[in-house]
Amino acid sequence: MNPGSAPWERRTRERMRAMSRKNGEWGDVRVGGVPGLSARVRPLPGAAGADTQPDWIDVTVMPREEPAAASRRRTSPRPPVRSRAEVHQAGLAESAQFHQSLMRWLEAHHLLGAVRSVSEPGSMPMLHLRCAPRVLDQLRRAPEFEAGTMMPLDLI
């Protein structure tokens, strides 16, 4: 038997030829420079185009610390020693409270539609949002939050 002449190999070659005719060859014009999308392929009805969808950015949000609290901390005596479990439970409670306050703030400022995802509360009062740039602008103006963007991995 010749190599490449097995029945399953012939069927595979025939399928590959049929798919290349159906989807176009690599030399076809690509949509938006994206490989694998042919200019002959139409978007689904009702699909939002790239011009109508906001550019999503990754944002880190934390509660803003008051300067007076930092100066009081230097002069105050050392806090009592707590177990790691107590510190962890206190962090979970503080993070959950911060998550609720951020969600209430987003709802009050009518920004929930511009937020794609919000991370779950953890053991630190810090959340990650995937949102439109206007949400970051509003968060930076708010006196109760400290917000900034994350560097994309492709720039590292």
From Swiss-Prot:
Keywords per UniProt: Cytoplasm
Compositionally biased tracts (Basic and acidic residues): 8-28
Chief location bin: cytoplasm
GO cellular component: cytoplasm
Cellular compartment(s): Cytoplasm
Region named Disordered: 1-89
Range of residues in the leader sequence: none
Reported function: Inhibitor of protease PopC. In non-starving cells, forms a cytoplasmic complex with PopC and inhibits PopC secretion and activity.
UniProt-recorded name of the protein: PopC secretion inhibitor
Organism of this sequence: Myxococcus xanthus (strain DK1622)
